[in-house]
Amino acid sequence: MRSRYKLLEKRLFRAIDLGSAFDGNSKYLFLYFDYEREYSGHKTDITDTDVEEIVKLLARYQFVSTWFIVGQVMEKYPDSVRNIQSYGNEIGSHTYSHLILREATLTQIKKDFSAFDSPKFKDLNIKGFHSPRDQWDVRALSCYANYGYKYDLLKTGLMDSPITFRFPPKNRLDSMVRFSSVIDDWDLFHTELEPEDVTRYFSKALDVFQAGTIAGIGFHPWLLVSDRNIWEGFVGFIKLLSTRKDITIKTCGQYAEILTGNL
């Protein structure tokens, strides 16, 4: 059954020609955070203060980002979520319960999407979705349509030529897009790198992905603060990013709005 889903995935998506909406001389980047806290499946030690330090760092350089947040985190730490948004960052869904879609039943998937559709979250203007562990499943398509999502995100690893996809009209998702993430911080977990190594790890993506394309770099807040060297390397990367005049940074939602207006 799973192999059937993988075949369907290959047939579902069509590459978008970014065309006149995006300057071919600039690289279009989005920064995203999977905000999971104790619901990540790992032992974590992160506070609201740690999270605020991240958003303040981004704000210092006038960067905005997209935070894909677990619904249970939204319920338990509402002040933290509001604070993230107050700095101009976008809020997206990382499922309600950090559900691994490819390991779940269809009933579990539908129940999770329904739980995330809580009235408590309505004013957060959530339009995007990112599957935990990047384990997306085609069975989520009907939920995308039913709950009004405008984009999703998947780590493709297509470092040099990230592709932005659209969903075909027959799925009631003709105005929905899929963004490509090229790298995240997961490979840094349990490593013993120096801060400059961490900075280089992230910055290599900036040099490789092509102008005229949209690409994402992802982070887990709990992982960033789990090791001082990782944190300092992340800070170094953000500082370096601020010097790159060839890179435009927007939220996923901002890119989606531009793209859906040109499909």
Where do the PLM segments sit?
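Short, flexible/disordered intra-domain loops and linkers
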Residues: S40-T47, F189-E194, S226-I230
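Active-site beta->alpha N-cap acidic-glycine motif
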Residues: R2-Y87, L240, D246
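Generic enzyme active-site microenvironment
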Residues: Y32-D34, G92, G218, I249
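Well-ordered, non-membrane alpha-helical segments in soluble/globular domains
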Residues: T47-I54, F113-S114, P195-K204, W231-F237
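Short, glycine/charged-enriched secondary-structure capping and boundary segments
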Residues: D45-T47, V81-N83, T107, C143-A145, ...
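Metal-dependent polysaccharide deacetylase catalytic core of the NodB/CE4 family, i.e.
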Residues: A59-S142, G157-D160, D174, S180-H190, ...
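C-terminal domain-boundary segment and adjacent tail
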Residues: K56-T66, S203-L263
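Active-site-adjacent pocket scaffolds in enzyme catalytic domains
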Residues: S3-D17, D123-T213
